[in-house]
């Protein structure tokens, strides 16, 4: 999620952000909780702005933890009214042993957790050492992906790779990506949650983690019963920025060598990290807290169809509005839902997931010509 309080030192849009030292986790969490309750600091109410896509959000169709999920994946009701800090900071189970996307066969019938990189071959330019403390992840954290397949007997419509928010200080999987994955699963989508690298790593290093997950899905498209081109990336707040960083600079044929000369490419790097659609949930293309509104910069990414979801009471409402208008004005296919009176950080709540899923299905169909 984005943060009102600056938990990083921001530079101009498109330039690398410099992370603050460890110990900023509490500030990041507090800032996001503030964003979930604080209205925009503007002279006029955002909710009075006429928008064709404006609607009153509802929790009627919000999906709770499915009965077949293991206890470790219990996220509760999925409703923002039941939010808890404990849930927001809960960590997803890590892979068993040294199971990776290369040494383990994809399992389309069960929840599966795999490390994204082989041990000792994780591309990085940040030196995260054992004496650096105060971060959400330990110094020896390895990025991983959690595959949550559709129910048995369901014909998959495509795949969605999800990234939770957390201001690059933590990953709110149990409030963002996991509830949404459960909802999309019920609608026929194979889902993959990426536990990408956080501070002190950079946005660029995290983008390589997302690219790796996309490559894994494309490699195993037949196993998961999907067309390899029917893959979307979506993220919440900082997770959406992470999805955008992939699409702007680290998709297709870009590999770990782009950041780390010592990285040794493997067979997965031969597969393009191509995504056919993007979902930006209370997020935008840019950097933490700063959306990029420059159409020339955005055009460099050859961006796919993009779907925005945000609330009128989000502190970043105006930036979401502005970028949506820029993107749609560039001729990029767009979709949007604006939830009247809703804040930042609502996750899968609000009644937007079905519309997003229907839009994705349309995009995937249109891509086939």
Regions found by a protein language model. Name each.
Residues 156-165:
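Short beta-strand element of the alpha/beta-hydrolase
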Residues 10-12:
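C-terminal motif of bacterial Sec signal peptides marking the signal peptidase cleavage site
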Residues 321-324, 328-369:
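C-terminal catalytic histidine-bearing segment of alpha/beta-hydrolase fold enzymes
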Residues 286-287, 312-317:
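Acidic catalytic loop of the alpha/beta-hydrolase fold
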Residues 212-301:
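Primarily recognizes the serine-hydrolase "nucleophile elbow" in alpha/beta-hydrolase
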Residues 172-174, 179, 194-226, 346-351:
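Catalytic nucleophile-loop/oxyanion-hole region of alpha/beta-hydrolase
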Residues 308-310:
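Short beta-strand/loop motif that positions the catalytic acidic residue
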Residues 69-154:
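N-terminal cap/lid segment of alpha/beta-hydrolase-fold proteins
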